[in-house]
């Protein structure tokens, strides 16, 4: 039994390491009304300077499980552009990474009467990745001589199309290959590119309705090992003037195992005045379920008033 537990833990730590390496792990943070974390094209959209702090603790109950903290902020610049910044700290067992992302987006109006817009975004990424061998059990392995660390400079590009309440974004992350001079090129992939597609629609029964339904889909493809995952989401919002409350569900699965979800996550949150709170609890539905109580995702935020743009492409 003990060997089975160790095997399962090692398996999922390995999978998480692949998702973790040189990028911010994408779980359900974007559903906390913060799609900027997955694409630079959302920089500056809205009439506020948006600040979001996120804490993510995976696989509660398993020692050295992944743990992530991030700070994201974006704001409008001029009438048709936006800038953003993302800082993150991520640990998974003996692997650690810290990074920053600086983003710029420009927003164009295709049809101002139909609220049809196109946005283009680019990000510069800085990442420090480290494998710490201090706590390795077998220090006599000749192949393990010291810590392994690398610094990566990279770029993201993205495009966003919006028409009325519909949106569709496509993003390519980490365009440049990784420097393998400090790693074994036989076992270490050098392709870091990830591809994201995010689309959804915000539906109201009538213009004056207090309730809004937002179904959405988030697709990720990892070039390093050919994996791909899909999120199916639905959110319900209830408005009270400029405040709102929401609740929903996030369903994630590997695309070759549609009927076997990785997790199902209830989500809820609220925006009151300029303050924001969001929470998600991911119920793990695979073999690790017997050893973990799940994953917690907490988001706190504040929207600082900036003033409306004269261009509807920024709304």
Predicted regions and their residues:
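Positively charged n-region of N-terminal signal peptides that target proteins for export
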Residues: 1-5, 110-112
């Amino acid at each position: 039994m003990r060997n089975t537990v160790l095997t399962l833990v090692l398996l999922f730590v390995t999978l998480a390491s692949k998702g973790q390496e040189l990028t911010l792990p994408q779980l359900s943070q974007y559903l906390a009304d913060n799609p900027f974390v997955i694409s630079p094209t959302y920089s500056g959209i809205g009439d506020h300077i948006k600040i979001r702090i996120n804490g993510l603790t995976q696989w509660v109950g398993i020692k050295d499980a992944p743990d992530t903290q991030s700070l994201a902020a974006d704001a409008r610049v001029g009438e048709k552009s936006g800038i953003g910044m993302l800082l993150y700290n991520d640990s998974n067992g003996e692997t650690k990474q810290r990074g920053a992302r600086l983003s710029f987006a420009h927003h164009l109006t295709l049809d101002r009467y139909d609220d049809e817009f196109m946005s283009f975004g680019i990000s510069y990424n800085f990442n420090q990745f480290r494998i710490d061998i201090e706590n390795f059990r077998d220090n006599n392995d000749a192949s393990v001589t010291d810590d392994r660390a690398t610094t990566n400079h990279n770029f993201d590009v993205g495009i966003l199309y919006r028409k009325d309440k519909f949106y569709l974004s496509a993003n390519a992350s980490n365009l440049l290959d990784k420097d393998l001079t400090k790693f074994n090129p036989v076992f270490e992939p050098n392709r870091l590119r990830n591809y994201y597609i995010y689309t959804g629609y915000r539906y109201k029964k009538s213009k004056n309705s207090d309730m809004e339904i937002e179904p959405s889909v988030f697709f990720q493809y990892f070039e390093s090992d050919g994996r791909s995952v899909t999120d199916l989401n639905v959110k319900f919002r209830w408005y009270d003037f400029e405040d709102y409350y929401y609740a929903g569900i996030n369903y994630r699965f590997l695309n070759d195992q549609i009927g076997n979800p990785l997790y199902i996550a209830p989500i809820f949150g609220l925006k009151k005045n300029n303050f924001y709170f969001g929470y998600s609890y991911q119920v793990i539905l695979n073999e690790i379920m017997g050893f973990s109580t799940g994953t917690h995702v907490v988001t706190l935020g504040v929207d600082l008033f900036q003033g409306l743009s004269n261009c509807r492409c920024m709304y």
